[in-house]
Amino acid sequence: MKTTAAPLSPRKTPIQRRSVATVEALHTATIQVLVTEGLSRCTTTRVASRAGMSVGSLYQYYPNRDALLSGVLELHLTKITDALEAACISVRGKPVREMACAMVQAFLSLKLANPDESKALYGVAAERDGARLMGVMYERMVNDIAQTLITAPDNTFPDPLFTAHMALGVITGPTRAFLEGFIPHDYTDQFQAHLSRLLGDYLKG
């Protein structure tokens, strides 16, 4: 017997101020449960309890746990992608080292603003809809970087799109290693400067 996958889209889009506040409360509660109890124990019951509402109220906005987690992850990724896009636009026509500093600063300003949240959401990204969301946002970021790189006066890239893929990897790889504790947090004060230099040196060739 063929089964139908449960929907991952929200039941309704919050329009009224009260609805927006409710969704924000659910997102905050979800992050808190993820951080304190882990992904496996992040249930709709626990999230609703943490948010101070009934499970029935939660289901008015999200039909199931997967949809809730997907919504939280999508918001997180959208904020980062939007910030990187704004940074790219702000440095178009600038030298590549200036571009590198702006891209790294924009990415880290959100990723490191709440390290526990960022780390917890890596686990959510491995869930059912995470790969799709990551793919959509990844493509946006790569395109934004590529469109910016071609405006650099010291642009020497034979393939700006491939360079953009590599540049994004230079940013995201060390950042994840830092958030997951592989890079000791003793280096917090130096991390952004070193990452900016690493990316700048790569782009400068």
Question: What does each of the following model-derived ranges do?
Answer:
Residues 29-33, 110, 170:
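Short amphipathic alpha-helical elements of helix-turn-helix/winged-helix folds
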Residues 1-21:
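N-terminal intrinsically disordered/low-complexity leader segments
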Residues 86-89, 120-128:
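Short linear capping/connector segments at secondary-structure termini
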Residues 25, 29, 33-67:
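Helix-turn-helix
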Residues 75-84, 98-101, 105, 109-116, ...:
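Amphipathic alpha-helical packing segments from all-alpha helical-bundle domains
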Residues 19-30, 47, 72-84:
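Generic hydrophobic, amphipathic alpha-helix propensity
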Residues 23, 44, 66, 70, ...:
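Short, structured helix-loop boundary elements
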Residues 2, 118-123, 131, 150-198:
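Hydrophobic/aromatic-rich alpha-helical bundle segments in the mid-to-C-terminal region
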